[in-house]
Amino acid sequence: HRDLHSFPTRRSSDLEGTLDDYAYAIQALITLYESTFDVKWFRLAARLQDSQDGLFADEAGGYYYTPRDAGHLIARVKEFFDGAMPNSNAVSALNLLRLHRLARGDAYRDRAMGIFRASSALMRAHPSAFAQMLVALDFHLSPPFEAVIARGPAPNEAVRAAAALRRRFAPSLVIASGEGVPMAEDRPPGAEGFLYLCRDTACLAPTADIEAVLSALEDVDVYKLDA
């Protein structure tokens, strides 16, 4: 099915969506969920990712730029190089890895690995043209930071805590709060606070001390390119 709409008319569009349309929309929805913790955005991101997989995926790895039923084309292409905008396969790789963390779904990670495999030879030969793909690869290789904000008594407490967490540069950080997202399940407020911070498989005790969590987020891997 097609998910492309025209704004501000809010009607379905007759145009066929491309991989760009899906990848950028999913990226925005995941970020919107992590900013508002409204589970409908997470669910919509997951639904659109399922649609993208069905319409664009190549089982050999990566995504074609046009949908599988675009019959008027002589050939379908897969693009991996960044242009004026980040490449949509690279954006998709990071989307899939973020969904893997939030949904605890290995299929998302497997799709991301397929993108890396399909683009690896080109990435090694032309790394400067793969900035967004390298961002996604760094996310995959870095031990992940996961912050779960258990619902507290104040309605906007989770949103305020998330805004504070984003004051630190932590590119592998994923944030979840509320019901309906597997990463946030089984995380009730503790006696000492409502904020859980985990790196890899090790978690700090729940705390209300945002500054302590911000200090922990300073432990970010730094990479230096050889001259």
Give the label of every model feature segment:
Residues 1-2:
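Short, well-ordered junction/capping motifs at the entry into regular secondary structure
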